[in-house]
Amino acid sequence: MATIALTTLASCEIETSDNGDFDGFWHLERVDTLATGGTTNLSKKRVFWGVQYKLISVRDVDKDKQHGYYLRFTQTSDKIVTHTPYKDNWHQDKGDNGGDHPIDDPKLLAPYGINNLEEEFVKEKLDGGQMILRSKTLRLKFKRF
């Protein structure tokens, strides 16, 4: 019996996240446009990034409580690169429109501060309570939710 248990445990690979403070649920509170100095206050809106393992879920709960977008990402100590976005259409058993569908229009991601299908963000600040990311055109300020 012990041999079976050890064999079973040895064959399992436990995947853990190395995301550090990036993991979690983030409220997008402000978007600054770098070229113009303009600011959009989103603190009263419900726009969120959820980060877990290798996936970011972005959604605007005020517009659609159940659907948003998923993006893959890579990160280093000083930057995050989002890529491979998908529309979250819930479960595949919902017919032809169910399941996650790749998107090719970056405008769909703009409400979340993402302007390209692959976007690089510099980590200006990332700690347990606050995150500031800067792309070539925007600065995004988040608060941990």
Q: What role is predicted for each listed range?
A:
Residues 32-37, 54-126:
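Contiguous, well-ordered beta-strand patches that form the walls/edges
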Residues 1-13:
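Sec-dependent bacterial lipoprotein signal peptides
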Residues 120-141:
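Short, exposed beta-strand-loop hairpins at the edges of beta-sheets
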Residues 27-31, 39-48:
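Transition segment at domain starts
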Residues 144-145:
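Short, solvent-exposed mixed-charge patches
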